[in-house]
Amino acid sequence: MASTTSTKKMMEEATCSICLSLMTNPVSINCGHSYCHLCITDFFKNPSQKQLRQETFCCPQCRAPFHMDSLRPNKQLGSLIEALKETDQEMSCEEHGEQFHLFCEDEGQLICWRCERAPQHKGHTTALVEDVCQGYKEKLQKAVTKLKQLEDRCTEQKLSTAMRITKWKEKVQIQRQKIRSDFKNLQCFLHEEEKSYLWRLEKEEQQTLSRLRDYEAGLGLKSNELKSHILELEEKCQGSAQKLLQNVNDTLSRSWAVKLETSEAVSLELHTMCNVSKLYFDVKKMLRSHQVSVTLDPDTAHHELILSEDRRQVTRGYTQENQDTSSRRFTAFPCVLGCEGFTSGRRYFEVDVGEGTGWDLGVCMENVQRGTGMKQEPQSGFWTLRLCKKKGYVALTSPPTSLHLHEQPLLVGIFLDYEAGVVSFYNGNTGCHIFTFPKASFSDTLRPYFQVYQYSPLFLPPPGD
């Protein structure tokens, strides 16, 4: 307790009587009292303080006179104050009032010299605070290092998780867009199928109705003829004997000769049938049920195109020599037609485009322009889809229609319904609808059409591959 009392006494001696705090930059005057330099200076600047004579003042405590020039720094007192500040920060034992200078290794706590002698610490390993401080400081620093590493890992994992969240949301959004797009394409496909089937049904209805109405009209004429004969016979029966017997044999012969011709039976069985569930769940199977084999026609190939021996692959290369200048050959662009011509029915064929960066695919009229002035648009007899680096996927309508596909088709399917005037494009791998041209009216032979780009060969797989 003596140590505590001594410390309190020194604190009182080091306290400025003006600001009542530990002195800052202490200075002493002639009488021996000390003050903060700033406090004593400000004190005598106060107009209420009376001067004894020029630059002479009274000590605030003892009223002894002193001259302002006699202020001198008290370094010894300053050092004491710093020591007191450090001592004031040190922890003391609540039970004994002594400072903690010892550390009990067994209990892991700070103790004073009196605690060390108490029964509860008897036999415990103790050491001076300054002796064990460095060791525990190193342990704490190691713990800090470990925790910082964990914090860094936590931060990395947090960033990684944030990135995963973003990636997951993007993935879900892409899938959401794909689902919407696929269903929209499927709805478009089903709508086109519905129109096609309804058109076929209407055509079948009109054909059968026409035959039935023709037969109905014939029966009307025959009914009138029979009524005329009946009336003639009834008049004879109601007349005189002479009228009845006049040309009676001829009348009877004509009557018995009248027959009701049986027309060829008109079937009421419908041929236009549609299994909607099958269309809905198996588009690819439906398309491939109309698949035909397509090969390339070398007589129409542009001079820069190289055809394989089986005529199923075409590549763009250098000008081919020894080629005729047939009017059937394309000269404006590197194009080639398929050998097969379509004049009726439904047809479907596929083109393996791979990861090529450009191509034009579709069908065209047999008599399209193949030289200067060639335009790929329906008005000129072309129904084609294009992929190019600058504009991506484009349907060559008039004007062109930009397409936004969620996945790159490696296999493109082209579907033609000649009677319905429909040309549609599909992703051959998934069956997803890509685009359908507005309804057209075909009157000429249609042929598969291909335009080949540099480093983007095209391959025509046989049906069923």
Swiss-Prot record:
One of its GO terms (biological process) is regulation of interferon-beta production. It catalyses: S-ubiquitinyl-[E2 ubiquitin-conjugating enzyme]-L-cysteine + [acceptor protein]-L-lysine = [E2 ubiquitin-conjugating enzyme]-L-cysteine + N(6)-ubiquitinyl-[acceptor protein]-L-lysine. Its main location: cytoplasm. Pfam families: PRY, SPRY, zf-B_box, zf-C3HC4_4. One of its GO terms (molecular function) is transcription coactivator activity. It comes from the Eukaryota. Its EC number is 2.3.2.27. Ubiquitous. Pathway: Protein modification; protein ubiquitination; Protein modification; protein sumoylation. Gene3D superfamilies: 2.60.120.920, Classic Zinc Finger, Zinc/RING finger domain, C3HC4 (zinc finger). Interacts (via B30.2/SPRY domain) with TAB2 and TAB3. This is E3 ubiquitin-protein ligase TRIM38. It comes from Homo sapiens.
